[in-house]
């Protein structure tokens, strides 16, 4: 299967690694532009870019996907599927319609719960005892597409949010490979999301983004500063 991959942070790395290991043809990788970090404010590449370059995969870092030239370039790849994992940008309709089999997203929650940019962090904030990942076809709304597969996992009593993050990114990679296999076989039945059950997981405020990855997740039962962070 020929795949165009879109992803940026650590959460997306295992998914790209799994696609490479499974023998899929990765025709290109789209990721966010390099950003200044550290005391010297030197430009640092996203983790997905570093992985792609190690495997000699072409990398593209447009500011957005709205430009006609960028959209024509994406269409010209002729990918069977566009896989999106924590890319950080919405895909316009011209991009969503480009691949033969659609755009498949790996999301770090059991949709329709926790749509948005920080599903794992809000899982921890709310003291949930169960977490998971969902694969879905992408639509124009924020995480509103039809669901394909889910994988659920309990949150361990002594598990830190850092450990949960790492488990879910690996679980997402496994679920992605299973999803693509079944998609290629025509063995998937997309399931629309129940809008009445949808909840949202927006980016965290500064007050809620204090980093402490050493505390057990289940210590937390209500929204307050706790063991959470944005994408690492």
Predicted feature descriptions by range:
Residues 223-232:
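Single conserved hydrophobic/aromatic residue that forms the stacking wall/gate
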Residues 14, 37, 92-93, 231:
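Glycine/Thr-rich phosphate-binding loops of Rossmann-like dinucleotide-binding domains
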Residues 27-28, 58-77, 90-106:
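Internal alpha/beta domain cores that form substrate/cofactor-binding pockets in large enzymes
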Residues 22, 81-200:
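Donor/substrate-binding cores of folate-linked one-carbon enzymes
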Residues 195-222:
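Internal anion-binding site segments
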Residues 1-40:
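N-terminal Rossmann-like dinucleotide-binding module
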Residues 36-80:
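N-terminal glycine-/serine-/threonine-rich beta1-alpha1-beta2 phosphate-ribose binding loop
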């Amino acid at each position: 299967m020929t795949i165009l991959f879109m992803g940026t942070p650590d959460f997306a790395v295992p998914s790209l690694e799994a696609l490479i290991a499974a023998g899929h043809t990765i025709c290109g990788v789209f990721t966010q532009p390099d950003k200044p970090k550290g005391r010297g404010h030197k430009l640092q590449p996203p983790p997905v870019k570093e992985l792609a370059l190690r495997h000699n995969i072409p990398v593209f870092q447009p500011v957005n996907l709205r430009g006609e030239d960028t959209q024509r370039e994406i269409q010209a790849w002729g990918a069977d599927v566009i896989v999106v994992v924590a890319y950080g940008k919405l895909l316009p309709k011209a991009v969503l319609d480009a691949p033969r089999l659609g755009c498949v997203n790996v999301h770090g929650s059991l949709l329709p719960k926790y749509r948005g940019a920080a599903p794992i962090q809000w899982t921890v904030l709310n003291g949930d005892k169960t977490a998971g990942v969902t694969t879905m076809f992408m639509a124009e709304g924020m995480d509103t597409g039809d669901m394909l597969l889910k994988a659920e996992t309990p949150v361990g009593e002594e598990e830190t949010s850092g450990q949960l993050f790492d488990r879910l990114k690996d679980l997402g990679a496994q679920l992605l490979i299973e999803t693509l296999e079944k998609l290629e076989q025509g063995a998937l039945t997309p399931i629309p999301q129940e809008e009445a059950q949808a909840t949202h997981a927006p980016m965290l405020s500064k007050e809620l983004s204090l980093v402490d990855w050493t505390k057990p997740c289940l210590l937390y039962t209500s929204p307050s500063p706790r063991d959470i962070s944005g994408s690492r």
